[in-house]
Amino acid sequence: MTLIPPTDHKFAALHGAVWSGGSFVYVPKGVKLDFPLQSYFRLNAKGAGQFEHTLIIVEDDASLHFIEGCSAPKYNVANLHAGAVELFVGKRASLRYSTIENWSKNMYNLNTKRAVVQEGGA
């Protein structure tokens, strides 16, 4: 957790203590993917939490389109989603990151998402 240290806030600390699973994508220098990559996370338990971690590294002169989805069934009790996303974009690299979420009114969604983009990156 480089961009989101557990000392950042209490939900980052909770995430850092219990996260399991997530996505890791590494795009080497000069590689340009011409199709989107996707991941999907579903919370399937009442009164539970979801703490996935997404780490994406796109090196210099590379490109990626990444789509992430999260959802849960409608429950009559509260649930917590406290995921974390860290994005690193190299020089002249391109990252198009999208999130699609479908939560019920009983879901507390407290994601933390951060990015570092180097010169000429987008």
Predicted regions and their residues:
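Conserved beta-strand/loop scaffold segments within soluble protein domains that form the structured core
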Residues: 1-122
